[in-house]
């Protein structure tokens, strides 16, 4: 495959080209994907020998290059550093549909790297990378049961759209990524605006039709350039050893698995395993380490098979629940006195403490990646410490799993967040997982709903989440509601569904089998809705509506609208005016280009004071209005009176009184308060005032009255001489 070959088709109205044979020729397989003006190179490499361990060492990397959008990376080094959250989430998105399609017992290391070379904003580099990953694998000599493909699906005015453009995505009420093989769906990731289960299922199946077409396209590429698959040594237990271990442990393992409480069950299972392992250690075998590793693997498979048999055949779950039963629920709000809002949610032995923090809009997150620059005023972060599962270990920066679970919670809650106009705050949620026995990401969604209600955030509706599971033996399958850790680990599906009482707001599905049929997806969504409504009922029994007042420790934000041309007056030369207001009141001030002013502090009195100062600065006098101000300057021709901060007017000497005034000082002195009426605002914005207009006029003999000509009182000003 030394010569470049190009394969083309149409994808969502754009040209899709796959180029092989020119780039990255030393990789096991490589493909350059051109989708519109988006260009992504994906290379896959598989090791020749299996790696020690009892897991499949697959690594998927998605590398964003800032040059792909004509940008120079920020920071001192001016080069790409650690992956962005978006890159991390994309790597997970690609990993999830690919991983189930490697054979059981595959232990050779496989690494897939997608590098983004060029980005067309309307042609998703993520979907190009997913397609490239599949192509690189299927044309390589690495055994892989693909191809797979993925597509984005939107819905605009009831019509489904493949790979929506940025403009279309803004109008869509569904943001769905679905992946799978020609025969079945095996990965779903979605956010939505309270859509029905039926609409979501139709979106998934609509996407699958396009996936089928892309898989057929890849078959053409395989036929033309695909390599012969190499022979791989799969990890398989010794049949005699397996039978021996099974005979010694199966009865005890069955009893241990039926222990309902998690820690007690884990202890009982561990006791069975230790007993069997000790019996083999006592034999002092030559290849002891290898045998013990194999025995440990066999014991885990016995544990897995027995749990699956109990659920599938006996309809008994390890903790004794029915297949559609939710674990006991409890929740609490307001347990942290100094934070802005807090919610503790417990479901069985899974517990999440979520905290809501409110901040001025200036605290938003700026995201400057491969897309257009974004401003996020709503964030959800998820933390999973080792103590939550009773283990020790170092605390590191958030990993892929924590970033992924945080993003899922954010997506689930995004739709119910009030608009900036309705609630002008930056909102940050942090979910601390304190206990975990499955479904911790969904517990964080429930805890976050409680925390926002406790903080007084006027969300559109409460949101709850539930994780569904599946055990499939042949054609028989059992769908599980609210899965725990063991069911997640040994089951075939982790299907997370979040939403309000009116519809779905987020969806995430991962499976360990080849794919799922429409029937299973339909039943899982229906069963998930029942569980979600049950949890929502519990949440609203704890707190049914947002608190009417924000925490005393939360910033209070007042919004003021001024004319855009007045912004410069509020800011002042070099920021002098706005800094003086901040120094005087201690508030934070943000001004938008449209003239919207946000004033924030914990002290509402200071907010009001700052508002009053700004209103005075931007206030415009109107003819006929009456003001009480202080005399700031006296001249021979009249007195200058400060009507309000930043605005003076002139009371001409002839407007001080009805009778003739010889000297201004006979009527007014510096610092006097005087009530005046605006009689004119000239074309230059100068304000002429009258004191006598508010005084009762003394009666004058008819013959003494003389007509008065209209007067302009401001003295003429000379133009400054040019230097």
From Swiss-Prot:
Native source species: Listeria monocytogenes serotype 4a (strain HCC23)
PANTHER family documented for this protein: POLYRIBONUCLEOTIDE NUCLEOTIDYLTRANSFERASE, POLYRIBONUCLEOTIDE NUCLEOTIDYLTRANSFERASE 1, MITOCHONDRIAL
InterPro entries linked to this entry: ExoRNase_PH_dom1, ExoRNase_PH_dom2, ExoRNase_PH_dom2_sf, KH_dom, KH_dom_type_1, KH_dom_type_1_sf, NA-bd_OB-fold, PNPase
SMART domains in alphabetical order: KH (SM00322), S1 (SM00316)
Family: Belongs to the polyribonucleotide nucleotidyltransferase family.
GO CC, alphabetical: cytosol
EC id: 2.7.7.8
UniProt-listed SUPFAM superfamilies: Eukaryotic type KH-domain (KH-domain type I), Nucleic acid-binding proteins, Polynucleotide phosphorylase/guanosine pentaphosphate synthase (PNPase/GPSI), domain 3, Ribonuclease PH domain 2-like, Ribosomal protein S5 domain 2-like
Subcellular location: Cytoplasm
Cofactor(s) of this protein: Mg(2+)
Catalytic reaction(s) noted: RNA(n+1) + phosphate = RNA(n) + a ribonucleoside 5'-diphosphate
Ranges of residues in domain S1 motif: 624-692
Basic and acidic residues: bias regions: 693-723
A GO MF label: polyribonucleotide nucleotidyltransferase activity
This protein's UniProt keywords: Cytoplasm, Magnesium, Metal-binding, Nucleotidyltransferase, RNA-binding, Transferase
The encoding gene: pnp
Name by which UniProt lists this protein: Polyribonucleotide nucleotidyltransferase
All residue ranges annotated as the KH domain in the record: 555-614
Region (Disordered): 692-723
Role, per record: Involved in mRNA degradation. Catalyzes the phosphorolysis of single-stranded polyribonucleotides processively in the 3'- to 5'-direction.
GO biological process: mRNA catabolic process; RNA processing
Location, primary (coarse class): cytoplasm
Positions of Mg(2+) binding: 488, 494
């Amino acid at each position: 495959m030394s010569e470049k070959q190009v394969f083309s088709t149409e994808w969502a109205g754009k040209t899709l080209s796959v180029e092989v044979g020119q780039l990255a020729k030393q990789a096991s397989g490589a493909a350059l994907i051109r989708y519109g003006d988006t260009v992504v190179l994906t290379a896959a490499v598989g090791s020749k020998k299996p790696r020690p361990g009892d897991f499949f060492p697959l690594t998927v990397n998605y590398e964003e290059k800032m040059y792909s959008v004509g940008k120079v990376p920020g920071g001192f080094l001016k080069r790409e550093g650690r992956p962005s959250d978006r890159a991390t989430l994309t790597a997970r998105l690609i990993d999830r549909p690919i991983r189930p399609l490697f054979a059981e017992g595959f232990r050779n290391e496989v690494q897939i790297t997608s590098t983004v070379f060029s980005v067309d904003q309307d042609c998703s580099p993520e979907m190009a990378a997913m397609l490239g990953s599949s192509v690189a694998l299927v044309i390589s000599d690495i055994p892989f049961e693909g191809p797979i493909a993925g597509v984005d699906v939107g819905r605009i005015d009831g019509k489904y759209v493949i790979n929506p453009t940025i403009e279309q995505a803004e109008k869509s009420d569904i943001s769905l990524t679905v992946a799978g093989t020609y025969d079945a769906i095996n990965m779903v990731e979605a956010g939505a605006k309270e859509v029905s289960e039926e609409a979501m299922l139709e979106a998934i199946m609509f996407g699958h039709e396009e996936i089928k077409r892309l898989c057929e396209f890849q078959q053409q590429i395989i036929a033309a350039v695909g390599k012969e698959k190499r022979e791989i040594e799969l990890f398989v237990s010794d049949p005699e050893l397996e039978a021996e271990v099974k005979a010694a442990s199966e009865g005890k393992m069955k009893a241990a698995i039926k222990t309902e409480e998690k820690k007690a069950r884990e202890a009982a299972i561990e006791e069975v395993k230790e007993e069997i392992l000790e019996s083999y250690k006592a034999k002092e075998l030559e290849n002891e380490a290898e045998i013990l590793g194999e025995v440990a693997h066999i014991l885990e498979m016995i544990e897995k098979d027995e749990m699956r048999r109990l659920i599938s055949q006996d309809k008994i779950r390890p903790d004794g629940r029915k297949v559609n039963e939710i674990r006991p629920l409890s929740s609490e709000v307001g347990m942290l006195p100094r934070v802005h809002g807090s919610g503790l949610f417990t479901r069985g032995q899974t517990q999440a403490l979520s905290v809501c923090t409110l901040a001025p809009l200036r605290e938003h997150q700026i995201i400057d990646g491969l897309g257009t620059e974004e401003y996020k005023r709503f964030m959800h972060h998820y933390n999973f410490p080792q103590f939550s599962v009773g283990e020790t270990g170092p605390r590191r920066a958030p990993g892929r799993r924590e970033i992924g679970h945080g993003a899922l919670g954010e997506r689930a809650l995004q739709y119910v967040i009030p608009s900036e106009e309705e609630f002008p705050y930056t909102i940050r949620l942090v979910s601390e997982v304190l206990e975990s026995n499955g479904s911790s990401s969904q517990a964080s969604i429930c805890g976050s709903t409680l925390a926002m209600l406790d903080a007084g955030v006027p969300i559109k509706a409460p949101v709850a989440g539930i994780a569904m599971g599946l055990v499939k033996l042949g054609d028989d399958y059992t769908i599980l509601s609210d899965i725990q850790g063991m069911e997640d680990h040994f089951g075939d599906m982790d299907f997370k569904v979040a939403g309000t009482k009116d519809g779905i707001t987020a969806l995430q599905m991962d499976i360990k089998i080849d794919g799922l049929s429409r029937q299973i997806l339909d039943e899982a969504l229906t069963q998930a809705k029942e569980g979600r409504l049950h949890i929502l009922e519990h949440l609203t029994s704890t707190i049914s509506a947002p608190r009417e007042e924000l925490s005393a420790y939360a910033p209070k934000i007042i919004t003021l609208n001024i004319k855009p041309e007045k912004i410069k007056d509020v800011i002042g030369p070099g920021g002098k005016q706005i800094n003086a207001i901040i120094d005087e009141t201690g508030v934070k001030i943000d001004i938008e280009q449209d003239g919207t002013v946000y004033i924030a502090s914990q002290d509402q009195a200071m907010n009001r004071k700052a508002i009053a100062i700004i209103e005075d600065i931007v206030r415009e006098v109107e003819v006929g209005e009456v003001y009480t101000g202080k005399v700031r300057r006296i001249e021979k021709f009249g007195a200058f009176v400060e009507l309000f901060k930043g605005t003076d007017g002139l009371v001409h000497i002839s407007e001080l009184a009805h009778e003739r005034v010889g000297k201004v000082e006979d009527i007014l002195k510096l610092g006097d308060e005087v009530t005046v009426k605006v009689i004119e605002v000239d074309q230059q914005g100068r304000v002429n005032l009258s004191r006598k207009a508010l005084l009762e006029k003394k009666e004058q003999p008819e013959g003494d009255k003389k007509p008065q000509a209209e007067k302009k009182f401001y003295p003429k000003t000379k133009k400054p001489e040019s230097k």
